[in-house]
Amino acid sequence: MAEAFSNSLSRATGIVTTSSSGTIGVYANHLSGISTVGISTGDIVDNTNYLAGTKVTGFGATAGTVTVDRVSTNSAEATSQIVSFLGVTSCYTSPAATKSILISGTFANNTENSVNLSIEILDSSGPTAALLASKIPVPHGSSFVISDTGKTLLEAGDVVRVYCDSDNAIDVNLSILTGVS
């Protein structure tokens, strides 16, 4: 396959579900007392008691309980917590039997407020994902740019995914080189 440049565009990314009544135990890998409506496995947990990139792994046997992949950082139980769950938007998937290179990307804030953005690469060869950028603040009327100084190799089936802490807030433009051998 010949190498080719292409753009991958995603309009108005950002999916957020928020609960204001969460309880987080001491060094706990679960949250309780929240509505689980709209929350999905793989959503990022946005709360000061969890490290950036903490993800929902499932739902507890007790109603209103969410399990996560990391333990909380709080040393005392935290009640009445506002917890946001950031849903994923898949912005690019490397084609089958093809390697691609993420050359650059522009992530434009299309809201009237500052938003935070996280970018993740999902490795198709295993259920592993790693953040390329985490909780990057993007002010109103501005954008975040991944420049050409650091390129990211994407193997067949790898996915570039975006999370944002505001609904429909980020427009994504990725520049990709496909057909790399």
Report each predicted region and the residues it spans.
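Small/polar beta-strand repeat architecture
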Residues: 16-87
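Extracellular and analogous surface-interaction loops
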Residues: 33-36, 90-99, 152-154
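Beta-strand signatures of extracellular beta-sandwich domains
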Residues: 118-122, 173-175
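Hydrophobic beta-strand signal
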Residues: 46, 84, 143-145, 161
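Solvent-exposed strand-loop boundary residues in beta-sheet-rich modules
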Residues: 49, 123-127, 180
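C-terminal interaction-tip segments
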Residues: 1-15, 86-112, 163-181
